[in-house]
């Protein structure tokens, strides 16, 4: 039978636990928390953080003292600060349950005003980071009066929140300052009324607040902040009008004029990188970013990171033609999570993240894999991975091959220090070369293999140092003066060093230091920034390849060092004796009597969310989600309230996330219905209160990796149902109650890669088994197996094919029935109108972009996308005492199978994914509908 199925069945819907998709957040480490109280903070730490506790407390109190004076405001309660030893451990925090990418340096949340951060940074940067996050705590108290509900519902622009934090923390370095300098002189400064997001929001907002203080003083800046609080929705335009009596257009004009004045001197004296030599390009018309150049010994190829495929790859560029030659990491992989590429996948540090082997056959790069990082040796001839080495330290990056190719030097963090390590490629063993409190990074070998040059920072700035490999304690300082010096490399004859420095006007340029005469020459004078110079021999002589920031992105350029300008001499190398440390304004002594173990785990409101979904037959699905957590997010109580067309459902769960094995307990009360038809009259009826299930379960899941996890549950359900029977040609419902113990086990995998609009590549699947026992009759009440598999095949950057196969089968004394239809399961059919204990449906879609942004005076629509789809499904009822005859196809036509085809559109509207579908049912030969069945629904697609 086609369309509605015969309503002769028994319904049991076993509650499934943990069958949601998504990659895993793996808790690799165990954290035994302690607390240290200071006048304004409660600092949470564990054993690996304790050696740095005094430093953290001093930086935090110094930041509080400065901000309280500037803002003339006091935080009423001690501020929780949760410190992690490294970024790898910080990524395991459960304060935010979602995955945390390495590009996120730290965060603050309005729920209990918590600051969460890693401490594996140079002291000066750590102090700025703490102050940045502390500004957010002041914002939560000033703007939201410490109320979580207001924080979640007030829509203050990202540029305001992050720009204020950046400005009051004064955390901009020379790389960051290059962004607004480049945007201003390129006439790309947006309006404060625009929705500025991403990294640019930090830089743009920083300069807005700098402008406000420059024009109206600190009092004017405070007025701006408090007027923003006084607007009901956080509308910045109203705050600007109230604080400065300016409309947005006037404010924008004055702001842009002020910016141009700030950069007048730079614009007059500096230029585009092309003025110093030609650029490298992937191909004509392709906009991409490139960074971290490394030159092959032959001089014919340059390895670099590139984003031309909307991913971060390692590619080779031809030096003579300055064009893309080969992609070494083409395609998608699960052998690693991502390549370690500063400014692309991780935050900025020092130096380059690629290295060529002396024989030119191998390119070294670090990648994230599991808890830490691995060193990948890429095949420069054919692409792909030749070999990989696990790295025992955290945050490994910036590889450099020794001249004999037997070892690789790199920067890493361990024991509270950032040092240079040496990896033996034959044994896989590594040893610490620098082992000092300074922040050491960006190593490079001298051509004779006797020395190592690296960048080291103990106070405000990083300088170049040299150590003797035969005696690593024998070190000398090579560069001096203002600014940071980094990213060194040797000239081909070994007589000079090329490096990047921001010693002039705070702008990074490329310099050449003659190691014999100590004469210094500047090779570039760019508006943005120039980094990571490497020497290459061409037919025209020695050239220097480097990366430069211009027109909003990083690109590779080549310049002639002979055209450089002499800018003086460096002092003679000096032996390293004493290094000046970074000193905070306030020093806090760690007193053991103020340290206490964390014993209680009280819960508090952490998050609230609401969602709605609507289908074409008028069915309204609404949900409210409430989450309560302890201080560290490791113990949570989640409550889900749901309404399906007037039927209310409830589920509450306690979840323990403190270790890798995650477990929980849940209780629930669930009611639902489906659409059926009387087999004799054909009259459609909507069955009210078809079933109700009340019960509880214990569940657990164990992540085997980022991509795969095992799950299981056992529990008990009390069921109250209306059981359908046929008597005398009429359909009757008999009340039936059951007590059902059950077991469940499954596997879930997810390797999906996402674009901003949704999944783009990879696959996700779940396979699980449920066994429900018959407490009354004995044996098995229902035994079922489920498979939900989805595959995404990229066709281009924003085109993909999407496939889904769902299948479920059940048997037993009273097998479970499964229902689907409508939304994006089987379009052209009513919601939940297809039912059976043996079901399957298949969806195929081609998804493509239509309009990226549609800006109207009253509305901004984004990601307007289209699709063409085909749905095929089947459902059969095969119960004890009744078996529905079923034949999927007959003579090339669908008989009991179901199918539809059509097209649809999706758009993000007011932050919600909204969908329109136009479907026609067909039997593989003939269309069964005259016109399209139109559906409108809100929710997330597969």
State what each model feature region is.
Residues 19-157, 174-176, 193-194, 235-239:
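Juxtacatalytic substrate-recognition/specificity segment
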Residues 73-75, 149, 156, 176-266:
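Amphipathic alpha-helical substructures
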Residues 554-555, 560-664, 737-759, 838, ...:
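Outer-membrane beta-barrel initiation region
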Residues 590-593, 665-672, 678-689, 696-699, ...:
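C-terminal outer-membrane beta-barrel translocator/porin domains of Gram-negative envelope proteins
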Residues 293-301, 353-362, 399-407, 443-451, ...:
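Blade-terminus and WD-like Trp-Asp/Gly-His loop motifs, strongest in beta-propeller folds
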